[in-house]
Design a protein with these regions (language model features):
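ATP-binding glycine-rich loop module of kinase domains
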Residues: 21-70
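Short beta-strand micro-motifs within the conserved protein kinase catalytic domain, predominantly
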Residues: 86-97
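Activation segment signature within eukaryotic-like protein kinase domains
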Residues: 125-126
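Catalytic-loop of the protein kinase fold
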Residues: 137-154
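Conserved activation segment of eukaryotic-like protein kinases, specifically the C-terminal portion
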Residues: 181-198
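Conserved catalytic-loop aspartate of Hanks-type protein kinases
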Residues: 211
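A conserved short helix/loop substructure at the end of the activation segment
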Residues: 266-278
Length: 332
């Protein structure tokens, strides 16, 4: 069986539905993990061709990549409510960077499967997702790629269905958004209007409210199997239409309370959208049994707390190790 550091791989890594990465599954200490390799960023470990100036530039870019990922994953692991799946490890082997997370035994649902559920169950699942996003936003972390593929559904030991948010690699902190020349990565169908304007070259503030718009689109699909309405002759995507000033049409099939909530979440002005916790509280009011403490809402995974997550050397050399245990070097 092929090995990757401490992991025994279940098969070759693949790029199916993976964007700028390849992924697969592996086992470590008897537990199953999802493993992702970042394709675009490579450390010049064996670069004997580049000039000293070019090599220094490559190393600096890698250091920036590492710093951003560590900060992002640290914030995720410190703030997750258990339904935003924590990162087990972020590490490098030779020139390639990887992360690992506990494998989720998902139900393989898409939004059309969710839409077939009773309305009360859809509301409960949306509340779980909103609470998970609120836990990220508590640390001012933006997921930036909320879409059906990045929300998995699974059964808990008690038999409830819960939701798990995955794939944070398009994410960033509000304090460190993509700069000039950097790309916002994600699915255009769920881009907020401000993300679209940023791509068009406008100067805009990118905040956690980006995720609220994406949730508005996603929740609309969960309830109706359809995207919010807009003029498809003028725009291809919801956020694009909103960025051009169009008010998205929320389905008349929705109950009035859900309809009004989605209208707020899809507001063209990010400052007028509710926070993720406000979305959760609205849904909790609609489903009185929903509380952040109940296991049918927040099903804590058994992935490690942030002080168990390691960043392996040679990403961090022992002589420069931070006192923060998230940056503790390990051995591969």
């Amino acid at each position: 069986m092929e090995k990757l550091g401490k992991y025994e791989l279940a098969g070759s890594l693949t790029n199916q539905n993976a964007g700028y990465s390849v992924w697969g599954f592996g086992k470590k200490n008897g537990k199953d993990y999802f493993i992702k390799q970042f394709v675009e960023q490579k450390y010049p470990a064996n670069d004997t061709v580049s000039s000293p100036e070019r090599l220094a530039k490559k190393i600096k870019a890698c250091e920036r990549f590492e710093q951003r990922k560590k900060a992002l994953y640290q914030m995720l692991n410190e703030n997750s409510d258990g339904n935003a799946v924590r990162v087990e490890e972020f590490f490098r082997i030779e020139s390639k960077y990887y992360i690992s997370m506990r494998k989720i035994e998902s139900l393989h649902w898409d939004f059309t499967d969710v839409a077939k559920l009773p309305s009360g169950e859809i509301r409960r699942l949306c509340a779980i997702i909103a609470h998970g996003v609120a836990s990220l936003h508590k640390g001012r972390m933006i997921h930036a790629d909320l879409k059906p593929d990045n929300v998995l559904f699974m059964k808990t030991d008690a038999g409830y269905t819960t939701a798990k948010i995955i794939d944070f690699d398009s994410g960033f902190l509000e304090t460190d958004p993509p700069g000039p020349g950097e790309t916002i990565v994600g699915d255009f169908h769920y881009f907020s209007p401000e993300a679209c304007r940023s791509i068009w070259g406008e100067e805009v503030e990118l905040t956690c409210k980006m995720d609220i718009f994406a949730l508005g689109v996603l929740f609309h699909q969960y309830f109706t199997s359809e995207l919010p309405g807009f003029n498809t002759d003028e725009s291809t995507y919801s956020g694009e239409a909103a960025a051009k000033g169009e008010v998205l049409a929320v389905s008349d099939k929705l109950p009035n309370d859900i309809r009004e909530l989605l209208k707020q979440m899809l507001n063209n002005d990010p400052t007028q959208r509710p926070t993720a916790m406000e979305v959760f509280n609205s849904l909790r009011g609609i489903v009185p049994s929903v509380t952040p403490e109940t296991h049918n809402v927040v099903h804590n995974d058994d992935t490690p707390a942030h002080d168990d997550v390691v960043v392996h050397s040679p990403v961090i050399e022992a002589s420069t190790t931070s006192s923060n245990p998230f940056f503790r070097p390990g051995d591969l």
